[in-house]
Amino acid sequence: MTLIFQLTLFAFVGLSFLLVVGVPVVFASPNGWTENKQVVFSGIGFWFLLVFAVGILNSFVI
């Protein structure tokens, strides 16, 4: 169970870093928002899923 928690937490941190870097780049590019809107929303949705998964898995680890 600890390994699953650690992998989920690593994915959460990695995705958070990608979103922190990627979303401003998308907004700064000329047609970035219209072309990458679906990718940004998918990333945000997956981020929320990982937030809840880390919270639930945390209750089993501690």
Swiss-Prot record:
Domain of life, source organism: Eukaryota
Bilayer topology term: Multi-pass membrane protein
Location, primary (coarse class): plastid
GO CC terms: chloroplast thylakoid membrane; photosystem II reaction center
Subcellular location: Plastid, Chloroplast thylakoid membrane
Matching InterPro entries: PSII_PsbZ (IPR002644), PSII_PsbZ_sf (IPR036512)
A single GO BP: photosystem II stabilization
Protein's UniProt keywords contain Transit peptide: no
Alphabetically ordered keywords of this record: Chloroplast, Membrane, Photosynthesis, Photosystem II, Plastid, Reaction center, Thylakoid, Transmembrane, Transmembrane helix
Pfam families named in the record: Ycf9
Transmembrane region(s): 8-28, 41-61
Family membership: Belongs to the PsbZ family.
NCBIfam families assigned: PS_II_psbZ
Function field: May control the interaction of photosystem II (PSII) cores with the light-harvesting antenna, regulates electron flow through the 2 photosystem reaction centers. PSII is a light-driven water plastoquinone oxidoreductase, using light energy to abstract electrons from H(2)O, generating a proton gradient subsequently used for ATP formation.
Quaternary structure (record): PSII is composed of 1 copy each of membrane proteins PsbA, PsbB, PsbC, PsbD, PsbE, PsbF, PsbH, PsbI, PsbJ, PsbK, PsbL, PsbM, PsbT, PsbY, PsbZ, Psb30/Ycf12, at least 3 peripheral proteins of the oxygen-evolving complex and a large number of cofactors. It forms dimeric complexes.
Stated name of the protein: Photosystem II reaction center protein Z
Organism: Tupiella akineta (Green alga)
Lineage: Eukaryota, Viridiplantae, Chlorophyta, Ulvophyceae, OUU clade
